[in-house]
Amino acid sequence: MTLKNFEFNVIENDKFARTGIIETHRGNIQTPAFMPVGTQATVKACLIDDVIKTGSEIILSNTYHLMIRPGVDRIISAGGLHKFMNCKLPILTDSGGFQVMSLSKLNKVDREKGAIFNSHVDGKKFILSPEESIRVQKGLDSDIVMIMDECPKKTTDYDVINKSMELSIYWAERSKIAFGLNPHKGLFGIVQGGLFKDLRTKSLNELIKIGFDGYAIGGLAVGESQNEMFSVLDDLKNIMPDDKPRYLMGVGTPADILGAVKRGVDMFDCVMPTRSGRTGLAFTWNGRINIKNNKFKNDNEPLDPNCSNLNLNKYSKNYLNHLFNTNEILGSTLLTLHNINFYQELMSSIRENIKKGTFDKFHDEYIDKL
């Protein structure tokens, strides 16, 4: 069977904001798109079929965690990640580089060997090179594959950021070679360079020379302010390729997403809606609420009376408050699904307003509210 090639087309523009379609052989993705995070082959506390019912068209999973547990060979034996977790949606996997830097007991970053580290689970030694990261992601049968890059810890040291960016470009070249010819999959480059305009510009230009199916913006959501993040996006919005999807990694809040879409970003992922859902924080069109608060004990209205999806409007704030204050697992499931559903409603509204040419008005109405 001939598999459909990976493809991206812009549909509408409203200044820098735009809608589009990413086509994969496992399904199409409307952009701007939000990807729920399924770190360890599961969107925590949720059945994948329920995640699909929220309107999610793609999810993200994590190479670092999956190569440690259960190991790529087990997933290959199951027929790939989609069959392993019974997921019909396209899946994007990150390279594992960010988690290596942030979670593991890192021993060494070697230009040729890659990242040499010990597992945060049992201390086992791993070597993650650009070639190994691509090998693992191919074994997972990911639909969108991320290159191996180095994501340094937050710093304002120009020389440190420059050295890291140069290493990431070298690893990008090796990732592209290791990926080979796989037209039915997408390989994304990752723009690094911290908060420095010249380094971000150089990183992007070098990645364009190598040639990728999409371009991610990495090294943000690591402690910088929202204004600093938007400044980086402003620096890049005029020079990012128009015909490739743009992915802002690890972002973010609804306000972050609105501001990034205004600056031309097409794709997002973040643990916020799922992690918040497990801790009792709900996103609504009127802002965030902590469902564990005592004021909801006698509130028999649903979180969102207009949300008929998954019958989520059948559950009152009174009941959800009870579930969380008695540590019942169902509370985490319901609120996680509510939050993912809210994020997908947000993305749908963003796309609709871009289509109508009213995105700026929508942005201004909600940027400080959500």
Annotate the PLM regions.
Residues G27, I59, D94, Q137, ...:
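Conserved, mostly hydrophobic/aromatic
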Residues K154-Y158, N162, G214-L220, I329-S332:
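Glycine- and acidic
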Residues M1-L181, N293-K297:
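Non-catalytic, usually N-terminal nucleic-acid engagement modules in DNA/RNA processing proteins
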Residues H25, W285, K355:
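Short, ordered coil/turn segments that flank beta-strands lining enzyme active or ligand-binding pockets
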Residues S133, S164, S168-W171, S175, ...:
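Alpha-helical packing segments of well-folded alpha/beta enzyme cores
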Residues E166-I169, A178, N182-L303:
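Glycine-rich phosphate/ribose-binding loops and adjacent secondary-structure elements
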Residues T2-I21, I29-A33, T42-A45, D149-T155, ...:
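C-terminal extensions of enzymes
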Residues M67-I68, K153-K154, G223-E224, S276-G277, ...:
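Short secondary-structure capping/turn micro-motifs that flank functional sites
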